[in-house]
Amino acid sequence: GGNHRGSIFRLHVGAALLARDRVSLPTWGVGSSAPPAVRESPTARAAEAAWERKVSEYIGAMTVLWVDVPDGPGPNSKRALIERNAISLLSNHLAPIESASMGWLGHHSPRHDIRRSSLWNLNHVDETYDPQFLDDLETAVEQTG
């Protein structure tokens, strides 16, 4: 399972899978909760559930690296600073450094910013990064162990 209406990452991955596989699922991404077309139709519910499983399989096969940043969430938190600047640094939106592999699913995304940046994010992909954040990232990596 999973819930693409509760995870923007799942939403983007699912939309790219739909585009790649040339599958039509008109209710995908509609609303922040399941619309009546899904709630009232066992067929639509089953179709979304099957696609959620496909998204889970795809995400489950990914290699993920995480860094522990033990502070509270918020726009001025250390984790927000690291996230914002890491996205800006890695994005190919402003100055392509290294493009995503040819097999990267994001090439099929209906979202131009995802295809252009080579990241699953939409926020911060067109910003410049502050190199000072690398010190904070290094500290977080060392603390993560």
Identify what each model region corresponds to.
Residues G1-G145:
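Boundary/linker segments flanking structured domains
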